[in-house]
Amino acid sequence: MSAPTNWNDLKKDITRRMDSAVEVLKKEFSGLRSGRASINLLDPVVVEAYGQTMPLSQCGTVGVPEPRMLTVQVWDKSQVKAVEKAIANAGLGLNPQADGQMIRVPIPPLNEERRKELQKVAGKYSEQARISVRNVRRDGMDTLKKMEKDGHISEDEIKKHEKEIQAITDETIKKIDEALGHKEKEIMQV
C-alpha cells in the first residue's frame, strides 16, 4: 500500500494498524490456557486424517458444556482415535477421553508455578503488541513529516496531528493494558 498523502487517510491507516495489533494480542491470549475451558484452546491442534494434516475445526465441533470441560463432536466416526491422539499430543497438557463420537476433554486446574509462567507469557505478548503500536506511531509521525516536506500540510497542522496520533496511541496502549489485566486475572483465578 502506498503512503497516505492526506491526514484522514493517515489517521485511518494508523487506527486500523493499531486496532489490528490489539486483535492479534487478543487472539494470542485466547490460546493461553487459564484453567477454564475455551473453544480457542484447541485451535493449535492439527489432526492426521485422510492422509493429510488438518485443523481440528475441520474434523468436528468443539463445545464448552462446563467451565472445566471441552467436548469435541467428531463428524466421522473413523477419525475419533486420530482426533483424540492429536489433542493428547498437542502439548497442551490435556487428557482427552473418547465416548462414541464425542471426545470429552477435562481441563485440569493450573498449579501456581504454571500460572506465573502464563502471566509472564501474557506479559511478553502484550509487550510485543505495545512495540507494534509504537512502531505504527513512529511510521505515522514520519509520514506526517514527509507530508509537510511535500507541502501537503502546514507546520501548525503537524503539531495538531502529532497530538492526535499520540492520543490514538495512548488509547490503544490502554486497551492493551486492560486486555492484559483481564487475562492475568483470568489466569490467577483458581
Curated annotation (Swiss-Prot):
Subcellular location: Cytoplasm
Chief subcellular location: cytoplasm
GO MF annotation: an example: ribosomal large subunit binding
Alphabetical keyword list: Cytoplasm, Protein biosynthesis
Keyword Lipid metabolism set for record: no
Matching CDD domains: RRF
Keyword set includes Cytoplasm: yes
Signal sequence range: none
InterPro entries: Ribosome_recyc_fac (IPR002661), Ribosome_recyc_fac_dom (IPR023584), RRF_sf (IPR036191)
An example Gene Ontology biological process: cytoplasmic translational termination
Pfam families attached to this UniProt entry: RRF (PF01765)
Source domain of life: Bacteria
GO cellular component: cytosol
NCBIfam families: frr
Family: Belongs to the RRF family.
Function: Responsible for the release of ribosomes from messenger RNA at the termination of protein biosynthesis. May increase the efficiency of translation by recycling ribosomes from one round of translation to another.
Protein name: Ribosome-recycling factor
Species: Paramagnetospirillum magneticum (strain ATCC 700264 / AMB-1) (Magnetospirillum magneticum)
Gene name linked to the record: frr
